Swiss-Prot record:
Annotated pathway: Amino-acid biosynthesis; L-arginine biosynthesis; L-arginine from L-ornithine and carbamoyl phosphate: step 1/3
Protein's gene: argF
GO CC entries: cytoplasm
Enzyme Commission designation: 2.1.3.3
UniProt-recorded name of the protein: Ornithine carbamoyltransferase
Pfam families assigned: OTCace, OTCace_N
Matching PROSITE patterns: CARBAMOYLTRANSFERASE (PS00097)
Top-level lineage group: Bacteria
Lineage summary: Bacteria, Bacillati, Cyanobacteriota, Cyanophyceae, Synechococcales
GO biological process, one term: arginine biosynthetic process via ornithine
Length: 318
């Protein structure tokens, strides 16, 4: 579905002032309109001015792509960002979160949180009177998913009939891929080692959002997962906060590396995605990451464009 600027604005009008905790907060049409707006902004077909509005960044985890893309997105939209990490505020000295959230709502126009616990994000959303954006928690990474599906749409021209294979840990990135993918009509085929599959509750939640003809398949076999896949997606085997498990996970995930042999078993014109940072030689080989099938750096760039679109919608800039 391609919409003109007026149609996009109409579909996204109801998002002004809302939180973005998960892609399931939006309708299928709203997610599609966000991707369309992202393309318009990327191609220079749309100009938006947020008029010096301020985005507060509360990041408890290290970040390159998420932090910088939000900073650049606000700058390009005529706004600005400020760093509000917990250690830089009175939260570090015990001020209740609900007090901090209400005060920040008087100074900022939106907050983007990157935190270990999803509960903290929900608490900010509860007490803030401005939009709260999920910039990554242990449960979901919805901004990443938006960028992923924009990249897939660019590669194939449409998301209709697309099958995405995810190889690796059933983590927060996969959770958002399932939820966003089902809203967009994408089939998801997953291969994870036993004990590292995605949360059944998230799988069921995604299935409730899906059209009856869509499928979400979970297995322990990477070859089964890539069969018929147009997209092969992987991520690190040990996420932030799991560094102590890295050696153990490296043994468990042996056989789940995205290498040329595995890629050759997917559709002929399949593409490769990874949200980065990558551990080359572990979840993905260097030759695959650098191959002509890789859209990994397009994917990283698209974080900027989808977050511009998201900020414009939530801050009422349309």
């Amino acid at each position: 579905m391609n919409m003109n600027s007026l149609s996009v604005s109409r579909v996204l009008a109801d998002l002004a002032g809302k939180d973005f905790i998960s892609c399931s907060d939006f309708t299928s049409d709203q997610v599609k309109a966000l991707l369309q707006l992202s393309s318009q902004l990327k191609n220079g077909d749309r100009r938006i001015d947020l008029g010096n509005r301020v985005l507060g960044l509360i990041f408890s985890k290290a970040s390159t792509r998420t932090r910088v893309s939000f900073q650049v997105a606000m700058a390009r939209l005529g706004g600005q960002t400020i760093d509000l990490s917990n250690q830089a505020t009175q939260l570090a000295r015990g001020e209740p979160l609900k007090d901090t959230a209400r005060v920040l709502s008087r100074y900022c126009d939106a907050l983007a949180l990157r935190t270990f616990g999803n509960d903290e994000l929900i608490e900010y959303a509860k007490w803030s009177s401005i939009p709260v954006i999920n910039a990554l928690t242990d449960l979901e990474h919805p901004c990443q998913a938006l960028a992923d599906f924009l990249t897939i749409k660019e590669a194939f021209g449409s998301l209709d009939g697309i099958t995405l294979a995810y190889i690796g840990d059933g983590n927060n990135v996969l959770n958002s891929l399932m939820i966003c993918g089902t809203l967009l009509g994408v089939n998801i085929q997953i291969a994870s080692p036993k004990g590292f599959e995605p949360l059944p509750s998230i799988v069921e939640r995604a299935k409730t959002l899906a059209h009856p003809t869509l499928k979400i398949c979970v297995s322990n076999n990477p070859i089964d997962a890539v069969s018929g896949a147009h997209v092969i997606y992987t991520d690190v085997w040990a996420s932030m906060g799991q560094e102590s498990e890295q050696a153990q996970r490296k043994e468990i995930f042996e056989g789940y590396t995205v290498n040329k042999d595995l890629v050759d078993k997917a559709e002929k014109e399949s593409i490769i995605l990874h949200c980065l940072p990558a551990h080359r030689g572990e979840e993905i080989t260097d030759d695959v990451l650098e191959s002509s099938a890789s859209r990994i750096f397009d994917q990283a760039e698209n974080r900027l464009h989808v977050q511009q679109a998201l900020l414009a919608a939530l801050l009422g800039g349309l």
